[in-house]
Curated annotation (Swiss-Prot):
Catalytic activity: a 1,2-saturated fatty acid + 2 Fe(II)-[cytochrome b5] + O2 + 2 H(+) = a (R)-2-hydroxy fatty acid + 2 Fe(III)-[cytochrome b5] + H2O; hexadecanoate + 2 Fe(II)-[cytochrome b5] + O2 + 2 H(+) = (R)-2-hydroxyhexadecanoate + 2 Fe(III)-[cytochrome b5] + H2O; octadecanoate + 2 Fe(II)-[cytochrome b5] + O2 + 2 H(+) = (R)-2-hydroxyoctadecanoate + 2 Fe(III)-[cytochrome b5] + H2O; docosanoate + 2 Fe(II)-[cytochrome b5] + O2 + 2 H(+) = 2-hydroxydocosanoate + 2 Fe(III)-[cytochrome b5] + H2O
Stretches assigned to the Fatty acid hydroxylase domain: 219-361
Membrane topology: Multi-pass membrane protein
Record's protein name: Fatty acid 2-hydroxylase
Source organism of this protein record: Homo sapiens (Human)
GO biological process, one term: sebaceous gland cell differentiation
EC main group: oxidoreductase
Domain free text: The histidine box domains may contain the active site and/or be involved in metal ion binding. The N-terminal cytochrome b5 heme-binding domain is essential for catalytic activity.
Localization of this protein: Endoplasmic reticulum membrane; Microsome membrane
Gene designation: FA2H
Amino acid sequence: MAPAPPPAASFSPSEVQRRLAAGACWVRRGARLYDLSSFVRHHPGGEQLLRARAGQDISADLDGPPHRHSANARRWLEQYYVGELRGEQQGSMENEPVALEETQKTDPAMEPRFKVVDWDKDLVDWRKPLLWQVGHLGEKYDEWVHQPVTRPIRLFHSDLIEGLSKTVWYSVPIIWVPLVLYLSWSYYRTFAQGNVRLFTSFTTEYTVAVPKSMFPGLFMLGTFLWSLIEYLIHRFLFHMKPPSDSYYLIMLHFVMHGQHHKAPFDGSRLVFPPVPASLVIGVFYLCMQLILPEAVGGTVFAGGLLGYVLYDMTHYYLHFGSPHKGSYLYSLKAHHVKHHFAHQKSGFGISTKLWDYCFHTLTPEKPHLKTQ
């Protein structure tokens, strides 16, 4: 028989006030206390919005308006649970049963995502690398991978390979922006020589000269095409559902994108690491050289590479930045947060919502919860 779990810690109002005075951000839900100090900078609504509610009951805020939080967001909150509030005056506790009853009326299909994470009883052993474990989850993988957690992930046993699977955000502009500048300078010089022509691989009679004035347009075309590629990869590759009986396809999905949905605030896994990125970028470059004349394909590629850099930087900012309310980035962040926590089958655009508009995959205005 398993031992009974230890009783929850309890805190008096004066103890909570001391922590608040020291700069901690504690909130409560009924009598349940949560320490959100480490989460405030990640809060989708902004740090100030959360700090303004320090010490308060957030039950009503979870239900909105202006925003009704998803079951995944409520489950995420439980990872910051620290104990119970004791010695509270009766008047301030009168509404607790009502608040708890309302917040628990979630869509039954979403109820499993509301469960608190028990690290010792989870489907995987978090003390070991996850990549070799997830393939055994089978039919449970899809539900498990879309239950986000607050802790970082380790994929590999080898420290070297593990290191290559992670990176800091600023490695992306440091490595790839100089390449964008070099390619742009090199191919513009080629255009300036006046020898660039289209269709030379098919005919010598009907070729079309490409003047250097076309360089900016081709570059911008590459950036625009990247936004479409970004959307298509995210929607059809990253969000494919691997067969439950395929150990290796589940592993592949997890290493490509599942890990990010499992640990959305693992800062070392938010942008594409340079080594695997080099392989993918190299394939794109070769494809452009095969399809188009060298200078034309290279220019489109350079624009696309800049689009990739902007995508990765935008993605990182959407997770860790605090855009001003009402700004485009604020709207984009809300769009992406809903993709992670409520609507994983929509909201595939990262750097722009353009293609979500075009293909009708915008995240709904309301989270996937039935209002009461």
